[in-house]
Amino acid sequence: MKTFNAKAEEVERKWWIVDAAGQKVGRVATHVATILRGKNKAIYTPNVDTGDFVVVINTDKMELSGTKWQDKKYYSHTRFFGSLKEMTAAQAKEKDSTFIIHEAVRGMLPTNKLSRHVIMKMKAYTGAEHPHAAQKPALFTLPSKK
């Protein structure tokens, strides 16, 4: 018996839709990262993109536990002296709520060339409407907390 190695052109990709309303950011991000990498499939191969497309809706209604809205900070730097900018999670939600889920999922992916390609398969939207109805995404229900 030979070891199976998936090929990128042979992978069938599905579209999933995840409703983030009332869910914790970390719980949504872990499941989205798993689907994006393809670890929920039997044909998972670490060096091949075997993951599916994910549409995350209602990112403006996500929750953070405790005082993370004020305590969690996002940093950016332009590499010029004195240009370190910081933004709290509340400010990020006010500016663009899709940024929070995007950064959470990006942090859960490995840092390599493949992850830069994988993160582009995630689409996040603030409301319930999205332009991907033609792909007929299936609803992904998050498992209940034990």
Swiss-Prot record:
Protein name, UniProt field: Large ribosomal subunit protein uL13
GO cellular component terms, semicolon-separated: cytosolic large ribosomal subunit
Assembly: Part of the 50S ribosomal subunit.
Top-level taxon of origin: Bacteria
PANTHER family named among the record's database cross-references: LARGE RIBOSOMAL SUBUNIT PROTEIN UL13M (PTHR11545:SF2), RIBOSOMAL PROTEIN L13 (PTHR11545)
Organism: Bdellovibrio bacteriovorus (strain ATCC 15356 / DSM 50701 / NCIMB 9529 / HD100)
InterPro entries found in the cross-reference section: Ribosomal_uL13, Ribosomal_uL13_bac-type, Ribosomal_uL13_CS, Ribosomal_uL13_sf
Role summary: This protein is one of the early assembly proteins of the 50S ribosomal subunit, although it is not seen to bind rRNA by itself. It is important during the early stages of 50S assembly.
One annotated GO biological process: translation
Gene of this entry: rplM
One Pfam entry name: Ribosomal_L13
Keywords: Ribonucleoprotein, Ribosomal protein
Gene3D superfamilies xref list: Ribosomal protein L13
GO molecular function, one term: mRNA binding
